[in-house]
A protein has these predicted regions:
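N-terminal signal-anchor module of multipass membrane proteins
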Residues: 1-73
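Structural signature of hydrophobic alpha-helical transmembrane segments
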Residues: 17-32, 73-89, 140-149, 212-222
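Membrane-helix interface "capping/anchor" motifs
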Residues: 96-109, 232-244
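Conserved PDZ fold ligand-binding element
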Residues: 317-339
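Interdomain regulatory linker/hinge segments that flank or connect interaction modules
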Residues: 208, 228-290
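Membrane-cytosol interface motif
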Residues: 296-320, 326
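PDZ-domain C-terminal substructure recognizer with occasional recognition of PDZ-binding tails
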Residues: 343-387
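Generic multipass alpha-helical transmembrane bundles of integral membrane proteins
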Residues: 116-238
Length: 395
């Protein structure tokens, strides 16, 4: 009995690992992490986070989200088929080829699929398309609409509570040619969810769980989904606008759930839901981009103090609990407002430093710590660099 249980769990996860979406996730994160580290080195001559962080940071939130979604899908008894899963895999690969991370979500994948359902009167008679519609027709539109809405709400929660976690700091030139800082939040969460498929579609073992619903016998399987997200922030600390985006996505998901419920009675509403999901999700991203462009740049050089653009993990700055968006006003009693001045003030005492920091509430706090050989020359604090003005040597 115990061995059968272990075999069941092993097979359960083997089917999960056999899904191409899992390997698509690994491949995409490989290239995303490589590009991120390259851009961080261009900005700061050092990486901020290890490449492995792109895998580890989203892993647990995605897993926990999958657990909560699975409770709902099991409770609703959502039934899909392997043919339907195959179409989802193909759509994920298609959207991955666009290189747009934010499109790698069920909002776009299932939204596109629902629109494809709606085109059946036009495309259903075509020789190569008819078999696809024949297989997709086995899955009611209301199920696809329900899955889309559930994942959109889950996407909103992931963005709100985990979207800004370890966002990547960068430097770029402003329109006036000055160096400014920004943060790039780019995540792909892997969300494994339990669905039901008709028994016999996959091989099982003696004690594999099966459920009978009328004349149909069902078996559960783990199916991985991807939820991608990207947002650039220049006008504030990254947490605020990203949390706002998450709240808007949750609200959109709740609003569209009315269409999902209505599609139980009027199936065509599911097709309308697919189109609205794509359009309004794009509008949310566009609105955030426009709003961000109108904001004054938050991470820039200023007359008083050095604003913290980033903090290297496990650095003296991290141990002193310095946070992104705080302003270092004094270093070892010396007022600073440039990266060069900050470094020079640190040299006053090479073994110890004391900082006066203006926190997010506008209050001064003190931070101090010992310095050791081999540590980052700027405590592990990433600042916006200023342009060096060279003196004319000709007199």
């Amino acid at each position: 009995m115990v061995m059968d249980l272990f075999q069941m769990i092993a097979i359960f996860f083997l089917y999960f690992l056999a899904n191409p979406i899992f390997y698509l996730w690994l491949i995409l994160l490989y290239f995303l992490s490589k590009k991120r580290v390259k851009e961080e080195r261009i900005s700061f001559h050092t990486r901020v986070f290890r490449r492995l962080a792109d895998y580890t940071i989203p892993f647990l939130p995605g897993l926990l989200t999958g657990v909560f979604l699975s409770i709902v899908t099991i409770g609703l008894g959502l039934i899909i088929s392997w043919e339907w899963i195959t179409v989802i895999v193909v759509l994920y690969v298609f959207f991955a080829l666009t290189l747009q991370v934010q499109w790698l979500t069920p909002t776009y994948v299932l939204g596109f699929l629902l629109l494809f359902y709606g085109l059946e009167p036009l495309l259903g008679s075509m020789e190569y398309v008819a078999p696809i519609y024949a297989e997709l027709g086995n899955i009611p539109l209301v199920i696809v609409a329900t899955i889309l809405v559930l994942f959109m709400i889950a996407e909103g929660f992931l963005i709100r509570y985990h979207g800004a976690t370890y966002s990547s700091p960068r430097l770029e030139r402003s329109k006036r040619g000055k160096w400014v800082g920004l943060h790039v939040a780019k995540r792909i969460w892997l969300v494994p969810v339990v669905f039901f498929i008709p028994e016999g579609m996959i091989p099982t073992i003696t004690h594999w769980p099966v459920f009978s619903v009328g004349d149909v016998t069902l078996q559960p399987v783990f199916i991985p989904f991807l939820i991608g997200f990207t947002q650039r922030v220049r006008g504030s600390i990254p947490r605020m606008p990203i949390q706002a985006m998450g709240s808007r996505v949750i609200g959109l998901g709740l609003l569209l759930s009315l269409f999902a419920i209505g599609s139980y009675y009027i199936p065509v509403l599911a097709v309308v839901l697919g189109g609205l999901a794509i359009v309004f999700r794009e509008l949310l991203s566009y609105q955030a981009k426009i709003h961000e462009g109108k904001q004054p740049i938050f991470f820039s050089t200023q007359t008083k103090g050095c604003i913290i653009l980033g903090v290297l993990p496990n650095s003296p700055a991290a141990k002193m609990n310095l946070e992104i968006g705080e302003t270092i006003v004094k270093v070892n009693g010396q007022e600073v407002n440039t990266e060069t001045g900050f470094y020079e003030a640190l040299q006053i005492n090479s073994a110890f430093c004391k900082l006066e920091v203006l926190n997010h509430d506008g209050e001064i706090r003190f931070a101090q710590g010992a310095l050791y050989d081999g540590e980052h020359h700027q405590l592990g604090v990433l600042l916006v660099k200023g342009d060096v003005v060279l003196q004319d040597s000709i007199t």
